[in-house]
């Protein structure tokens, strides 16, 4: 028998309204115990909420949704009372005294909705993303995902793969036909079409992942290069202490900002040098840890000091120590001291931004560069949010499509192509939860709020 769960659906703490949600086959039993009746489905009823001895604990609106016409697909009872935490706790305690009722786990209401086919997995995740959105664009995109925009694109891909799989397997099952299906060009054309279709979805998903998770950008360089001043300029406030004393920043400073809707985690680090001070050495060690985990590095150079701005020395002292795949933007700071104009150029395969963090001249160039470098497009309508697991699944699907193309065009191997298409279908279906593991479901829903 399915379990009946209860939890507070509104945020803990003091508020104008507090809501308790009950979901499961015993929701009507709870209604009879607390309200003395079960409200008509989908009709608001103003009633007292009573304790076991008949004492009125609160009074408010009761709503009943009969299965399957509810968010979870189960019978659902919502009690909307006053938002005092003591009152809500008393009411919750009373409900938990009823046999067969237990406290919901985090995300369990959404999990019920998923298991009852009210939402697919991508839509369920979008609920948490909508709650956690840190910008207007992220909220709008999360709502698009909740409404099924992302799932629709994935399902269209799955349908295309299934159609092609059927065609390929038919050519394998009927080898005596006069027509060589593998060589007639139709399968290759369809396969290339799916590859292009998937690339479009991957591009949108990458944008959605940036919106959801942000990008980690680490500002690094020698002491007194102006790293903290740049952090303040990008943040638009005095987030870091700035002095003329080299080594002022000794620990990692973090600031979360938005550039035209793109979330960035900007991290200011201790100046990189051979330090004798133990505290500074620890700060430098932490700086290298952050650098290794970054999505992009901003390497600060002091343009007023010819030695520190020498790119050949910078390459040997710093750039050579970085992973080759880690993107780096070089910033020549303090152009106000030598009369230079703000500019953007390219040298040795690196983008170089010349600016003044002190006067903010050229800071907009850096902001625009970061947007472009991260592949972020401002103001896209109809986008959706995506998670890292979605990107991983799409990437694996793309890899197997390319392998399948090689099996078809170079080896004429229908059986191997069919297997690659099966794997593609499996990876894509993981996104919406058609094929997934219990461990994955547990990890996803445990990250939700209790009551969602």
From Swiss-Prot:
Compartments in which it is found: Cytoplasm
The keyword DNA-binding is annotated on this UniProt entry: no
Segments forming domain TrmE-type G: 214-375
Keywords: Cytoplasm, GTP-binding, Hydrolase, Magnesium, Metal-binding, Nucleotide-binding, Potassium, tRNA processing
Signal peptide extent: none
Gene3D superfamilies assigned: P-loop containing nucleotide triphosphate hydrolases, Probable tRNA modification gtpase trme, domain 1, tRNA modification GTPase MnmE domain 2
GO CC annotations on file: cytosol
Pfam family, one: MMR_HSR1
Primary location recorded for the protein, binned into one broad class: cytoplasm
Oligomer status and interactors: Homodimer. Heterotetramer of two MnmE and two MnmG subunits.
Name of the protein: tRNA modification GTPase MnmE
Organism of derivation: Haemophilus influenzae (strain 86-028NP)
């Amino acid at each position: 028998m399915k379990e009946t769960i209860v939890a507070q659906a509104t945020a803990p703490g003091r508020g104008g309204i507090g809501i308790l949600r009950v979901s499961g086959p015993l929701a009507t039993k709870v209604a009879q115990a607390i309200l003395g009746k079960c409200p008509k489905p989908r009709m608001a009823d103003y009633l007292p909420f009573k304790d076991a001895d008949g004492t009125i604990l609160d009074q408010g609106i009761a709503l009943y949704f009969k299965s399957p016409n509810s968010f979870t697909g189960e019978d659902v009872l919502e009690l909307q009372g006053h938002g005092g935490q003591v009152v809500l706790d008393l009411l919750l305690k009373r409900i938990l005294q009823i046999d067969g009722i237990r406290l919901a786990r985090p995300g369990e209401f959404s999990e019920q909705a998923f298991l009852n086919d009210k939402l697919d997995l991508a839509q369920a995740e979008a609920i948490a993303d909508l709650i956690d959105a840190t910008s207007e664009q992220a909220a709008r995109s999360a709502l698009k995902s909740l409404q099924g925009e992302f799932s629709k694109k994935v399902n269209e891909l799955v349908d295309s793969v299934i159609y092609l799989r059927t065609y390929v397997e038919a050519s394998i099952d009927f080898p005596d036909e006069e027509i060589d299906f593998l060589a007639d060009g139709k399968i290759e054309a369809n396969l290339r079409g799916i590859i292009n279709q998937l690339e479009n979805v991957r591009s949108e998903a990458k944008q959605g992942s940036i919106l959801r998770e942000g990008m980690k950008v680490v500002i690094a360089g020698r002491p007194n290069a102006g790293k903290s001043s740049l952090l303040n300029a990008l943040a638009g406030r005095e987030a870091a202490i700035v002095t003329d004393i080299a080594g002022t920043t000794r620990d990692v400073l973090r600031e979360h900002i938005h550039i035209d809707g793109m979330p960035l985690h900007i991290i200011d680090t201790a100046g990189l040098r051979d330090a004798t001070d133990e505290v500074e050495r620890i700060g430098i060690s932490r700086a290298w840890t952050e650098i290794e985990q970054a999505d992009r590095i901003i390497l600060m150079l002091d343009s007023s000091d010819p030695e520190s701005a020498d790119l050949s020395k910078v390459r040997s002292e710093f750039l050579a120590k970085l992973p080759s795949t880690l993107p780096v933007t070089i910033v020549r700071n303090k152009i106000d001291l030598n009369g230079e104009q703000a500019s953007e150029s390219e040298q040795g395969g690196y983008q170089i931004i010349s600016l003044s963090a002190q006067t903010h001249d050229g800071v907009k160039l850096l902001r625009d560069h970061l947007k472009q470098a991260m592949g972020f497009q401002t103001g896209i309508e109809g986008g959706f949010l995506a998670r890292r697991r979605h990107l991983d699944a799409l990437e694996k699907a793309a890899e197997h499509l390319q392998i399948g193309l090689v099996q078809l065009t170079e080896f004429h191997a229908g059986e191997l192509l069919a297997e690659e298409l099966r794997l593609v279908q499996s990876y894509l279906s993981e996104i919406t939860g058609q094929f997934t593991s219990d461990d994955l479901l547990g990890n996803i829903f445990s990250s939700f709020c209790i009551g969602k």
